[in-house]
């Protein structure tokens, strides 16, 4: 495309377009493809029939994709906004982007800013998140310097600037992610703040937050849309942690006639929440809802839900809480919503939404409101049904969780909730190939929504293509692995593919830093030992299976060699170590690695148990950080 199109745009407009582009480009590969457009319209929650959305996307791809490579580059995106500005299609596209979380109003045109959708969206999120964080951290002595924040000012954007609140919120969502001993709480110089923000961002990444576009400087500057985007991911991970069958067997009460436990386990947390709300609504004789936006605007479903889940005082030591339904017949929507929220308050669940958020059907905040209700009062009984195979509910292994978090942190779409079920159409695997510089021909890929008939065939074709790419050009070892195995969700064989993707991703980072020199296990081990001895450390490693790694001393020493003086050796145990000592060392080592800027996905247990694959990623990430020393 010629440069002409971008010349008449002001720098501010160009920055806004870049920001908008990043919001649509979910996997951050620099291009927008049609499934990302589908996702955009789905998230924007616009009152458009499905065929209309498909029509708009088709038109955008035809008009925007000028070099016909099946995707829209940034220049083509700019062209859409300039040349197609006045068309209805472009207006709808703009509206969808403005409704997606964020803060800039595209193009700065009066029609857009007068709608004010964007600004008011994030104001509401800010208000909701501030109240949630205030409550969560009200008794934490380390946060007294910023808590409570005023939800009506910009307190939040200043409060996250030193990294402490972010670290605390990450630990509330996934306990023990960050070793408290690694958080700098005193004498907060700019350098020390930078370390806290590294720790927060790399830990957020390790629990599955997509932080590719966020840097420590963005958080220090309190950039609102980035702060809110990151906080929402952290809060959501915490809210959704228990909406999962292996952690909450009573969810099996939501099984429908003829449905297997396996089918129920494939649902996302959002789908399970909707199923849960409808289970209680059916029991109350009220109609079902299809979403947490348009269908809850009148608060009537919420009244019935609260009435169903409120404790009836029948169990030992359970206080009875009566829900007053008189507000149900209030004629004014806002007053009805306020009356409903007063009842939610009796349950200690007046969180995330204001009456206006309910009436406007804000999907994100209403989802959070319902998730919080579920966590406090699920009101489900585990079925004593004989024909349920409870052995299926083993829950994911640590390794599976690490792989899943790694994928999600790279921004794959759809979000991976269940490692095997969510990879059965290979879309996520194909996106990961792009991340490891294996080109994917997206015109060969079948994308959802799949047809009712033959859906599995379409998914299998994708899986076959994924295996084909793995053999060549990726040169993976895939002996005995076929597309059918991915499509079946075969755990061992799917893991074999996923591990090779993660390994290649890790090595690519090193090769980029080492001017393209090939990296492998021996090179990493040699670098580790050389760096340790040059820093005068007595530790060394033979290989990634070396049993001495279980003390984490080699990792701790390597961190101190990369950034001299950063380790507080008073906190590190050596000599004859108990299991607790080993675990404490490993926890400190992983957090300190993240604090000095290494994006470590492995868990402390991986070091203690010397899991060679994960140990390799730890040393490779540290080598990457070590090579960045200027």
Curated annotation (Swiss-Prot):
SMART domains: CH (SM00033), EFh (SM00054). SUPFAM superfamilies: Calponin-homology domain, CH-domain, EF-hand. Gene3D superfamilies: Calponin-like domain, EF-hand. The keyword Phosphoprotein applies. It is found in: Cytoplasm. The modification Phosphoserine is found at residues 268, 293, 326, 339. One of its GO terms (molecular function) is structural constituent of presynaptic actin cytoskeleton. Its main location: cytoplasm. The keyword Repeat applies. Disulfide bonds: none annotated. Residues 383-627 are annotated as: Actin-binding 2. One of its GO terms (cellular component) is neuromuscular junction. Residues 109-382 are annotated as: Actin-binding 1. InterPro entries: Actinin_actin-bd_CS, CH_dom, CH_dom_sf, EF-hand-dom_pair, EF_Hand_1_Ca_BS, EF_hand_dom, Fimbrin/Plastin. Keywords: Actin-binding, Calcium, Cytoplasm, Metal-binding, Phosphoprotein, Repeat. The modification Phosphothreonine is found at residue 391. Residues 12-47, 52-87 form the EF-hand domain. Ca(2+) 2 binds at residues 65, 67, 69, 71, 76. Residues 123-239, 267-378, 397-506, 518-627 form the Calponin-homology (CH) domain. Ca(2+) 1 binds at residues 25, 27, 29, 36. Monomer. Actin-bundling protein. This is Plastin-3.
């Amino acid at each position: 495309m010629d440069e002409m199109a971008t010349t008449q745009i002001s720098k501010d407009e160009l920055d806004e377009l870049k920001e908008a582009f990043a919001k649509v480009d979910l996997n951050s590969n620099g291009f927008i493809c049609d499934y990302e457009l589908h996702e955009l319209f789905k998230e924007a929650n616009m009152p458009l029939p499905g065929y209309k959305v498909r029509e708009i996307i088709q038109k955008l791809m035809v008009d925007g994709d000028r070099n016909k490579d099946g995707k829209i580059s940034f220049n083509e995106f700019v062209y859409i906004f300039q040349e197609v500005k006045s068309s209805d299609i472009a207006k709808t596209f703009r509206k969808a982007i403005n409704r997606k979380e964020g803060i800039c109003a595209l193009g700065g045109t009066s029609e857009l800013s007068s709608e004010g959708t964007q600004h008011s969206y994030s104001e509401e999120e800010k208000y909701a998140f501030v109240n949630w964080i205030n409550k969560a951290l009200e008794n934490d002595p380390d946060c007294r310097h910023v808590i409570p924040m005023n939800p009506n000012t910009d307190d939040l954007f200043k409060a996250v600037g030193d990294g402490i609140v972010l670290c605390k919120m990450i630990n509330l969502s996934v306990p023990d992610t960050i070793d408290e001993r690694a958080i700098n709480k005193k004498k907060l110089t700019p350098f020390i703040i930078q370390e806290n923000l590294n720790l927060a961002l790399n830990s957020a990444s390790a629990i599955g937050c997509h932080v590719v576009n966020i840097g420590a400087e963005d958080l220090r500057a309190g950039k609102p849309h980035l702060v809110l985007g990151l906080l929402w991911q952290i809060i959501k991970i915490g809210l959704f942690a228990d909406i999962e069958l292996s952690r909450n067997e009573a969810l099996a009460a939501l099984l429908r006639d003829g449905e297997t436990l396996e089918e129920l386990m494939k649902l996302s947390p959002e789908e399970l929440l909707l199923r849960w709300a409808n289970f209680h609504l059916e029991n109350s004789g009220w109609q079902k809802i299809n979403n947490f936006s348009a269908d809850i605007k009148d608060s009537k479903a919420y009244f019935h839900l609260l009435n169903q889940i409120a404790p009836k005082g029948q169990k030992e030591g359970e206080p009875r809480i009566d829900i007053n339904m008189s507000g149900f017949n209030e004629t004014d929507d806002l007053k009805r919503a306020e009356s409903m929220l007063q009842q939610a308050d009796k349950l200690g669940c007046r969180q995330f939404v204001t009456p206006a958020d309910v009436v406007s059907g804000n999907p994100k905040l209403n989802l959070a409101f319902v998730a919080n209700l579920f966590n406090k009062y699920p009101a489900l009984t585990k079925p004593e049904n004989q024909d349920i195979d409870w052995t299926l509910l083993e829950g994911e292994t640590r390794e599976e969780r690490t792989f899943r978090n790694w994928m999600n942190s790279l921004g794959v779409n759809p979000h991976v909730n269940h490692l095997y079920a969510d990879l059965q159409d290979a879309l996520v695997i194909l996106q990961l190939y792009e991340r490891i510089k294996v080109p994917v021909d997206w015109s060969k890929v079948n994308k959802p929504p799949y047809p009712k008939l033959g859906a599995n065939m379409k998914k299998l074709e994708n899986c076959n293509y994924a295996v084909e790419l793995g053999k060549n050009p990726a040169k993976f070892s895939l002996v005995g692995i076929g597309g059918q195995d991915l499509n079946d969700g075969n755990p061992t064989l799917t893991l074999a593919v996923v591990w090779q993707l993660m390994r290649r991703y890790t090595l690519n980072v090193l090769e980029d830093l080492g001017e393209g020199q090939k990296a492998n296990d021996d090179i990493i081990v040699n670098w580790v030992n050389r760096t340790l001895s040059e820093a005068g450390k007595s530790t060394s490693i033979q290989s990634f299976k070396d049993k001495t790694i279980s003390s984490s001393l080699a990792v701790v020493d390597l961190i101190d060699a990369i950034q001299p003086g950063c380790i507080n050796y008073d906190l590190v145990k050596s000599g004859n170590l108990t299991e607790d000592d080993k675990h404490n060392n490993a926890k400190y080592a992983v957090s300190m690695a993240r604090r000095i800027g290494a994006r470590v996905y492995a868990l402390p247990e991986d070091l203690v148990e010397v899991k060679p694959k994960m140990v390799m990623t730890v040393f490779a990430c540290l080598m990457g950080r070590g090579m960045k020393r200027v």
